[in-house]
Each structure stands twice: as C-alpha cells, then as structure tokens.
Amino acid sequence: MRKLTVAAVQMSCSVNPEESIKKADALVMEAVNKGAKLILLPELFERQYFCQERRYDYYGFAKPVMENEAVKHFLTVSKKTGTVLPISIYEKDGNVLYNTVAMLDSGNFLGIYRKTHIPDDHFYQEKFYFTPGNTGFKVFDTSVGRVGVGICWDQWFPETARSLTVNGAEIILYPTAIGSEPVLNTDSCGHWRRTMQGHSAANIIPVAAANRIGTENVTPCEANNNQTSSLTFYGSSFITDMTGELVESADRTSETVLVHSFDLDEINAARLEWGLMRDRRPECYGDIVR
C-alpha cells in the first residue's frame, strides 16, 4: 500500500502578493496539520487575476522561476514540512512569458510545467500575457508518487488528462482561476466540474482542482484603456476518486482546505484491470490532431 494524502486549497487573493503568500502559507500549514503531503494552491494565487485587463506594465509581474517570491517562500516551506507543493506563477524566461507551475518537493526544485492551452476573451485575456507552453505534458516523479499537472484551461481538454495518464501520472492536479462568464452569460461551475470528473473516470485516476474565490473588479484607467470588468470566482474546488466521484468538495465562497487519502497501488491495479490503456488505438486517432 502506498498512501497519498492530497489537499486542495481554496482562497481569495489580494492585490498585494505578500498578503496572498502569507494567507497561502497559513492554509498550507492547515493542510500539513491535517496530514497532507501533496498540497495544491490555486492558479496565479500571488495576486488578483490580472488577466481581466490588458496592461503592458503587468508584464513586470513575470519573474524567472527561482526569483519568484512564492517559489522562494514555499521552497523553504516544502523543506520544513516534507511536502510536495506545485506553485503556480507568472514566469519570465529570457524575453518570453509563461503561465507556469514550479514543482517543489521537500526543499528540492523538480522542474516546471508551462500551460499548454491559453484562453482568450474579454474577461480572461491570457493570450495578452502568456506564450503557449513548450514543456509538453509533464509528469513529475515526487516523493509521494507520480504527479501530473494541467493549468486551468488545460482541464477542459481530454488530451491533457490522457497524455498525463499515458505518461504515468498517478494523480492529476489542476490549479485554477475560473468564475463568472459574462460573455457566455452562463454559470459554468457544474460543467467545469463534470469535465474533470469525466477525465478522472476515463483514465481511472484521482483529480484535484483548486480554485480561487471572491469578486475582483477592474478600475478603469489610462493604462488599461478605461476598461471596466468584474469577475466573481466560484470556488467549488474538489477532489475525485479514481472513478470521477466527488469525495471532497468546497462551496463557492469559503476559504477551505480539502484533504483526502488514496492508496496509489490500489488505483494503479484497478487501471490495469480495466484495460483502458491496453485497448487504446492511437493509430485510429488521427482525426483529433488535424
């Protein structure tokens, strides 16, 4: 038996990165005290979701991985607590900017995953800020198991989850920043959850999604060309079992630490017994890569 205890942290985010990191630290320690060894924070939790507006000065938020304040802080936390912490950041690599997760394990930096699928509409203007990732779908060999990571919009694509599972992931994590959909005029929360529950079921793999909460408003100014915008992030973070069943679930408004334990050996055996990886026919799937 290989026991994995995972936590998904749901939190509101401040305009002040120091405040956000301090809050995230307290929630991570709450997860540690509940026995978690793999702890997921939301996407870009250092500050409010700046992608609501287009501002050239916000490019300055991006830093090289090891110069990022959240990475530096949580590298120490991971060493002190013996935990695995995927940290979502705005990365600068040379003159290229990415939406990135840095994987930290017990004081060690294991590498990065860069967001593959970049969304764009009036309220989620990520193409203005991020270049599509060039890392491929990464599975990290950590002290608690093989961990696959997708970032927010990646979670809507079944190819992400299948690629991670084929590459040996034993759990999939999705740091997220999602909420109201003013352009679509819909409440996407149920759709959002069911999408990842389906990925979990189809791959016989647990999934954890950590979302932010709260309403974040954009103030019109010259720097953003007088844009008006507001998003209410709907939380609803969750953890599924290997069949896609919700085993832990947060509400829409509360700061929450969800914790659940799995037997990875049991899950891996079940995946083999189902034969889903065995019975794949990659030679027949050309239509989806046109």
Give names to the regions the model predicted.
Residues 66-84, 152-256:
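CN hydrolase (nitrilase-like) catalytic-core segments centered on the catalytic cysteine
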Residues 63-66, 76, 92-198, 273-274:
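Active-site catalytic loop in hydrolytic enzyme cores
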Residues 53-61, 121, 222-227:
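Short glycine/proline- and charge-enriched loop/turn segments
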Residues 265-290:
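A conserved C-terminal secondary-structure "cap"
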Residues 87-89, 100-103, 138, 237-239, ...:
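Short beta-strand scaffold segments in enzyme catalytic cores
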Residues 17, 26-112, 178-205:
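Cys-nucleophile CN-hydrolase/nitrilase-fold catalytic domain and related Cys-dependent amidase chemistry
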Residues 1-38, 173:
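N-terminal active-site segment of His-dependent metallophosphoesterases
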